[in-house]
Amino acid sequence: MIEADRLIAASGRDREEVQDRAIRPLSLDEYIGQPVVREQMALFIQAARGRGESLDHTLIFGPPGLGKTTLANIIAHEMGVSVKSTSGPILERPGDLAAMLTNLEPHDVLFIDEIHRLSPVVEEVLYPAMEDFQLDIMIGEGPAARSIKLDLPPFTLVGATTRAGMLTNPLRDRFGIVQRLEFYNDKDLSTIVSRSANILGLAIEDQGAYEIARRARGTPRIANRLLRRVRDYAEVRGKGQITKAVADMALNLLDVDERGFDHSDRRLLLTMIEKFDGGPVGVDNLAAAISEERHTIEDVLEPYLIQQGYIMRTPRGRVVTRHAYLHFGLNIPGRLGEGGDFSEPGDE
């Protein structure tokens, strides 16, 4: 199974990039959710513009699909400058980075997605560019090689990553602003769904938007993807209007349940419960039982289930929690305890 094949995958798809561009917010006023990040960035941007300076280099990290690219574009828009975009894997040689840096105008934004994947040799070139706005490049080869310095216009590097822990300390320390994006709550996601529907010219009720939002795993990219699929259902079977009932029927047809789980999530949980008595079970045994690769379980399936409190990692292996039994309407084993709060995660 490939992550991008799943309807609820947080990673982006090439065609979606074009579709999402039409519904992306362009300013902080349009930006929904992440209140702390929004307030801080508004303050930093206003201060930088007031001084006539470029914004400090900014690192944005968090799970995929939460709007890191969107925020980078908003920063450029609010600063009134252009944004040049690239990604870590694309910048293979120092010359690739040098070409982008030398084409920047004063105060422009250079956005590097997946910045944790920069090669060490490219990263070394980036250090003086970030710190001193200078580019050190080598001319010639062998004994005749010499280093020259090129002055760069002041610019803002905005780096985005899903794995902040993989950044080297020297690179991380050169960012003056560091922002973490959190998963969205259902209310903010519902507002995002309603806004996207309005831009796309769709008729949607508030309850319909909320039904989509609560199954979107706290991720705007997934919410917008589900909205497009529910739109298809509404146009064919729902008279074009997205109500709560239409959204519920569409998402059930798409095999996305009320917790945002799909078939793969449920199969993993049920396998642990039915074949391994809830665990502990080693990841290799689990991979063999559900015919998946080990890395698929570790990188694709597990993270959301752990974050939502349905699976725990222990020294002896993976264990399901009482919430997994409750989700499927199963009796909770006595070893998990009879007392305490048996509500599912997220319930009040």
Curated annotation (Swiss-Prot):
Keyword Hydrolase in record: yes
Region (Head domain (RuvB-H)): 258-348
Enzyme Commission (EC) number: 3.6.4.-
Positions of DNA binding: 294, 313, 318
Region (Small ATPAse domain (RuvB-S)): 185-255
Swiss-Prot/TrEMBL keywords: ATP-binding, Cytoplasm, DNA damage, DNA recombination, DNA repair, DNA-binding, Hydrolase, Nucleotide-binding
Region feature (Large ATPase domain (RuvB-L)): 4-184
Swiss-Prot/TrEMBL catalytic activity: ATP + H2O = ADP + phosphate + H(+)
Gene Ontology terms for molecular function: ATP binding; ATP hydrolysis activity; four-way junction DNA binding; four-way junction helicase activity
SUPFAM superfamilies, alphabetized: P-loop containing nucleoside triphosphate hydrolases, Winged helix' DNA-binding domain
Cell compartments where the protein resides: Cytoplasm
InterPro entries, A to Z: AAA+_ATPase (IPR003593), AAA_lid_4 (IPR041445), DNA_helicase_Holl-junc_RuvB (IPR004605), P-loop_NTPase (IPR027417), RuvB-like_N (IPR008824), RuvB_C (IPR008823), WH-like_DNA-bd_sf (IPR036388), WH_DNA-bd_sf (IPR036390)
GO cellular component annotations of the record: cytoplasm; Holliday junction resolvase complex
Keyword Nucleotide-binding: yes
Binding residues annotated for ATP, in chain numbering: 23-24, 65, 68-70, 131-133, 174, 184, 221
Coarse class of the protein's main subcellular location: cytoplasm
Binding annotation for Mg(2+): 69
GO BP annotation list: DNA recombination; DNA repair
Chain's role: The RuvA-RuvB-RuvC complex processes Holliday junction (HJ) DNA during genetic recombination and DNA repair, while the RuvA-RuvB complex plays an important role in the rescue of blocked DNA replication forks via replication fork reversal (RFR). RuvA specifically binds to HJ cruciform DNA, conferring on it an open structure. The RuvB hexamer acts as an ATP-dependent pump, pulling dsDNA into and through the RuvAB complex. RuvB forms 2 homohexamers on either side of HJ DNA bound by 1 or 2 RuvA tetramers; 4 subunits per hexamer contact DNA at a time.
Subunit structure: Homohexamer. Forms an RuvA(8)-RuvB(12)-Holliday junction (HJ) complex. HJ DNA is sandwiched between 2 RuvA tetramers; dsDNA enters through RuvA and exits via RuvB. An RuvB hexamer assembles on each DNA strand where it exits the tetramer. Each RuvB hexamer is contacted by two RuvA subunits (via domain III) on 2 adjacent RuvB subunits; this complex drives branch migration. In the full resolvosome a probable DNA-RuvA(4)-RuvB(12)-RuvC(2) complex forms which resolves the HJ.
Comment field on protein domains: Has 3 domains, the large (RuvB-L) and small ATPase (RuvB-S) domains and the C-terminal head (RuvB-H) domain. The head domain binds DNA, while the ATPase domains jointly bind ATP, ADP or are empty depending on the state of the subunit in the translocation cycle. During a single DNA translocation step the structure of each domain remains the same, but their relative positions change.
Family: Belongs to the RuvB family.
PANTHER family xrefs: HOLLIDAY JUNCTION BRANCH MIGRATION COMPLEX SUBUNIT RUVB, PTHR42848
Protein name: Holliday junction branch migration complex subunit RuvB
Origin species: Pseudomonas putida (strain ATCC 47054 / DSM 6125 / CFBP 8728 / NCIMB 11950 / KT2440)
